[in-house]
Regions:
Chain A
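Terminal low-complexity/charged segments
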Residues: 1-171
Length: 171, 359
């Protein structure tokens, strides 16, 4: 059954992707299927996301890392237990958000924007996720004291911040 | 008139380091905004400064309640890249450690529910029953939280006849206590009054947001990794997936209790049918260049690890995602429309793990 679903997914992906791509699939000893896809046109990620949505799938997580002078994103998407890993290289440090298509990508996109400073186009709520506004984006990899990295630094500082915000709203 | 109130680490309603901005109209929550990041520690970056064996220790310390699943999923990724085949015995032992953790973790969350609804005798009763699991952990693995059961190519512990007998005896002690407590959680009027119809997550929202674990299963969504993408010995020890349709706090409570029962069954089955063989390979493996993605079902839901290596001693990139990370946004669906006094109960019902989420 999984094999048939895999064939359908692959056929649909091939049908929708406009640019060049590399595609392979693997099966482990327990019969779990993973599809590995590399896209050469970064815009194609929107088409892939649409395929996932049409099959009732979800975004599990997106891994970002730096390779030489550019960033690479690996999208991990799931359709009923089949994992689809999609690699996209970002030479202009910009990527289209798939959150409007797959809500489940919301946080992970905000996180790579924050940690790696990757520009995100079309995200409905591109607010900071973990780090304080005073810290520059793309911080992962730089040394920073824990007290500074944490939003509140200490409970009393956090409390003072919230209190001042509250009073600001009232006036 | 609307009122804005903050709930967070400085407020009596919530012990967790998260800040909720709540808009109220009367007693009803209209809108909720969540701010996190208080305990972000940059562990993901740290993992890339440590070698493959040091990372066993580091991943175990991401969080205490899922502390077995982190190294478990991590070693599976390393093994996949290195092409290591783990023995059947080791796979069974991995399942034993994992299910013991699941029982203890679920029971902790459920006792917190009793605490938050002010049913303190029930909380004590649940925690006392849970002590049996803590005793098992301490006796077998030497620790009450971090069990350090997994290593690359197998497990670090073995079970002899005496230990198996001890675990079985303690589970026989636990089960009748669990049955008694379950009855209270399922039927007592105080519990029902505070949980039925509270914090509803409809099935379509659960699917849309990609929630996992008991949060998903409480809304009738089955994405249990043990069944959807089996690993270790789960393909042999057939897991019965527990599903509830209600989508409210009560449904999630029921899922967890029924899973406790199912895990007791799994532990019994695994230790009584333990295959013979080595528990770990003799030789330390070389980890070549490659990439792998592995998943496991932590007590809170799906945990996924992505590992990329380049042939050196340390990972080139390691990224993981914990269940709470996905369940968080569902709170925006669950909380509005409920009473202010229910916020902490709803929040607890996703079994939040903030240290995992922020890493």
């Amino acid at each position: 059954m999984k094999e048939t679903l895999k064939q359908k997914i692959i056929a649909e992906l091939k049908n929708r992707i406009t640019g060049d791509f590399d595609l392979r699939d693997e099966k482990d000893a327990k019969g779990n299927i993973q599809i590995w896809l590399k896209l050469f046109n970064r815009k194609d990620i929107l088409h892939v996301a649409q395929v996932i949505k049409d099959f009732g799938g979800r975004c599990v997580i997106i891994s970002a890392y730096k390779k030489d002078d550019h960033h690479v994103l690996v999208y991990h998407l799931d359709i009923d237990g089949i994992l689809i890993n999609v690699e996209v290289e970002l030479f202009d440090n910009t990527v289209d958000s798939i959150t409007p298509i797959l809500d489940s990508a919301n946080w992970t996109e905000r996180e790579f924007k924050e940690m790696f400073g990757i520009k995100l186009v079309g995200h409905p709520n591109p607010k900071r996720l973990f780090l304080d506004e005073s810290i520059a984006e793309g911080i992962l990899g730089e040394y920073m004291p824990l007290s500074q990295a944490m939003n509140g630094a200490a409970t009393c500082c956090m409390w003072e911040k919230i209190e001042s915000e509250r009073h600001k709203n009232e006036h | 008139m609307s009122t804005k109130i903050p709930i967070g680490p400085f407020h009596i309603g919530l012990e967790e380091p998260i800040y909720f901005k709540i808009d109220l109209e009367g007693e009803t929550v209209k809108n909720v905004d969540m701010i996190n990041g208080f305990v972000h520690r940059g562990i993901e970056y740290l993992a890339m400064q440590k070698n493959f064996f040091q990372n066993l220790i580091l991943t175990e310390r991401v969080c205490s309640l899922c502390s077995n699943n982190h190294p478990f999923t991590y070693v599976m990724a390393v093994e996949k890249i290195a092409g290591i085949e783990v023995s059947r015995r080791a796979n069974y032992l991995r399942v034993v450690a994992d299910e013991v953790k699941r029982i203890a973790s679920h029971m902790f969350n459920l006792s917190m529910l009793a605490h938050l609804i002010g049913f303190h005798s029930l909380m004590t009763q649940t925690m006392e029953a849970r002590e049996i699991m803590q005793d098992i952990k301490e006796s077998i693995w030497g620790n009450r939280m971090d069990m350090s059961a997994n290593t690359i190519s197998g497990v670090k512990y073995d079970l002899d006849e005496g230990q198996i007998e001890y675990i079985l005896k303690r589970l026989d002690e636990l089960e009748p206590q669990v049955d008694e407590i379950i009855d209270i959680y399922f039927n007592h009027k105080i519990v029902k009054a505070r949980t039925v119809g509270v914090g509803v997550l409809p099935k379509e929202d659960a699917l849309r947001l990609g929630v996992t674990g008991p949060t998903a299963r409480g809304s009738g969504v089955n994405n249990d990794v043990r069944v959807k993408a089996p690993y270790a010995a789960y393909d042999e020890l057939k897991v019965n997936v527990i599903l509830e349709e209600g989508g409210d706090v009560h449904a999630r409570t029921k899922v967890r209790w029924r899973e406790v029962k199912e895990s007791i069954r799994l532990v019994r089955e695994a230790i009584t049918n333990l295959p013979e063989g080595p528990v770990v390979l003799d030789k330390r493996p070389h980890i070549p260049a490659g990439e792998a993605v592995t998943r496991s079902e932590a007590p809170r839901g799906e945990l996924i690890y992505y590992l990329k290596t380049n042939g050196a001693q340390k990972p080139e990139r390691m990224r993981w995602r914990v269940p709470t990370y996905m369940n968080w946004e569902a709170l925006r669906v669950m909380i509005p429309g409920n009473k202010l006094s229910d916020v902490a109960v709803i929040f607890n019902s996703i079994d939040p793990c903030i240290s995992c989420t922020e890493r």
